Structure formats: C-alpha cells, structure tokens
C-alpha cells in the first residue's frame, strides 16, 4: 500500500479491520518487534492516541500518522489545522466525512478481506475519462447543463467553449454547494465537473445521488481544472510528463494543502512569460481557441460534452 498524499481516508463498517489496523501500528510503536507485528515502511509509522495528542503531534515529523475515529477531536477545526500545516502524512480511520479537510476522491479506501489476507481498495473508481460512479452506468441522453464548482477561470473556459451550443453552463460557486444545486434541478440532465483533488468529503453523497439519477446525472472529477490544462498538451515546449505521472514525487505536502494547490502554482509559474499566462480569475484567450479547447475537452468528453 502506497501513501501518495498528505491525507488518506480509511472507512468501512464495524468489523472490517479498521481499528485492528490502528491497534497494530500502536502496538508496534510501543514495543517494536516484541509486539509480534511486522511493519515495513520507508518512513516512520506512528499511531496518535487520545491522550495528549497535541504534544504527540509536535514530536512527529516526516512520518505517517494513523488516527482512529476514537480520537475525540478528530473532526475538529483544531485537528484539521494540525493536519494541514504539518510535514506528516495522515491516515484517518473514520466512517464520517471531514468537511474541513481537502482530500482526494482517489484517496478514500476500504479494507477488503480475502481469507486471512487484507488489502486496501479504493472506495470510488475512475470509470473512464475521470467519470466516477458507484455502479457502472452511462447517460442515455445528451446533457442540458454543465455544472462546475467555481465561477472563475474554469467556468469561463466552459462557458466560452459551449457559447454556440445548446448546452448551458452553470456554477455552483463552491464544491460544497454541488449537492444542493443538484437537489434543486432533478428535471435537468447535468454533467458535473469538479476538482477531484479536494472532493473527497462530498463524493459519497453526490455519487449516491447520481446513482439514483444515473440516466440524467454524470459526475466528472479530474484532479483540477489546472491539471486538465496541463494534461491537454496545448502548451508547446512544456515538458510535464514526469510531474503528471508521479505528482507525489514533486509535491511537498507541508507546502501544498492539496494537489489542486500544487497544479495551480505549477501552471502559473510555467506559463508566466507566454500567451498561456495563467490567472485563476480570468482564463487566457490562448486556452479558448478552437483546437486548444477541443484538446482540453477531449480529456473529459461524454456524449454532447466535447
């Protein structure tokens, strides 16, 4: 099992092995190999116990910190602050979501048991072109609305691209407002685009709603809008292959709260002296030109969204 980001979520019902995992790390932390636990990792693994957790955290650096939902403050803003401004990587074991933390839809796992073996498997899977669903399904009709999470460069790009089509673009304003927006538009055929890098908290409810309305709602979760622009290949002379293939090798988790933040800064820095100079408030014209915008849309294309 490879930890890639600063926040990893492990969830599941009682009896699936979540607490056992935490207890084994805690036992190894206390007594090492005498605990009977074998733990192999490239960096220290520690368990954060309920007692004096603040002082414990202050002594952990560049470690993988396992935290069980039994910790009373695990969902508090204070704990979230410690997670976001730390050199550590956190594995949070909880059945509940964390609305105050930006974690990826790709870093939510459950423990799968096969005989005496246990493994981590993603709760949500990319079913092609960054579209996520609880069950395999495909929209049976074209979409009438493209809904995105922001009102800035991403929304401006989509609005420009579909200006001469029958597809309407709308903004939910924030990722947390997407569910409420969908609740009020049951009769519409909606293609949702949101930044997967920070959508983990909302994935369960939004994807369950999509499963109910699978004929009319599709949820597309690329890493971020900036990631789409970088992946499209429209910026000539920019070699981003290594960064896109293994972002974890380039991203300092203490500096960037999520991969979304990293890709925004990376794109801004790399395009500073070109016609693609990126500004989150206003999409550069160069990205919106016909062939360029078509390359971006090809990464998420679905029915009449292309």
Q: For each predicted feature, which ranges?
A:
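Acidic, divalent-metal-binding catalytic cores of TOPRIM
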Residues: 72, 111-306
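Structural recognition of the conserved hydrophobic beta-strand(s) that form the central parallel beta-sheet
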Residues: 66-67, 88-97
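Post-Walker A helix-loop "phosphate-sensing" segment adjacent to the P-loop in P-loop NTPases
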Residues: 27-38
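Hydrophobic anchor at the beta1->P-loop junction of P-loop NTPases
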Residues: 10
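Post-Walker A alpha-helix
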Residues: 21-23
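Short glycine-rich substrate-engagement loop in P-loop NTPases that contacts/grips substrate
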Residues: 36-60
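Conserved glycine(s) of the Walker
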Residues: 16-18
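Conserved P-loop NTPase "ATPase switch" module shared by AAA+ and STAND
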Residues: 52-77
């Amino acid at each position: 099992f490879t930890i890639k980001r600063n926040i990893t979520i492990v969830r599941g019902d009682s009896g699936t092995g979540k607490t056992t995992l935490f207890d084994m790390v805690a036992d190894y932390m206390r007594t090492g190999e005498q605990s009977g636990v074998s733990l192999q990792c490239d960096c220290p693994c520690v368990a954060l116990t309920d007692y004096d957790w603040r002082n414990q955290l202050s002594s952990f650096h560049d470690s993988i910190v396992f935290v069980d939902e039994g910790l009373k403050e695990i969902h508090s803003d204070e704990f979230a602050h410690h997670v976001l401004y730390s050199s550590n990587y956190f594995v949070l074991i909880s059945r509940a979501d964390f609305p105050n933390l930006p974690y990826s839809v790709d870093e939510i796992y459950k423990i799968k048991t096969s005989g005496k073996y246990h493994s981590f498997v993603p709760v949500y899977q990319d079913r092609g072109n960054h579209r996520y669903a609880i069950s395999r399904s495909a929209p049976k009709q074209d979409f009438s609305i493209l809904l995105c999470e922001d009102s800035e460069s991403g929304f401006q790009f989509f609005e420009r691209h579909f200006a001469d089509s029958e597809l309407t673009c709308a903004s939910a304003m924030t990722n947390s407002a997407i569910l409420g927006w969908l609740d009020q538009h049951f009769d519409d055929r909606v293609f949702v685009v949101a930044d997967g890098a920070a959508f983990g908290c909302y994935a369960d409810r939004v994807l369950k709603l999509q499963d109910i309305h699978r004929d009319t709602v599709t949820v597309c979760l690329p890493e971020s809008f900036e990631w789409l622009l970088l992946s499209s290949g429209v910026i000539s002379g920019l070699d981003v292959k290594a960064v896109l293939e293994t972002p974890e090798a380039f991203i300092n988790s203490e500096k960037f709260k999520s991969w979304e933040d990293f890709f925004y800064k990376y794109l801004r820095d790399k395009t500073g002296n070109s016609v693609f100079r990126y500004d989150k408030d206003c999409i550069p014209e160069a990205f919106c030109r016909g062939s360029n915008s078509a390359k971006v849309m090809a990464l998420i294309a679905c029915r009449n969204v292309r």
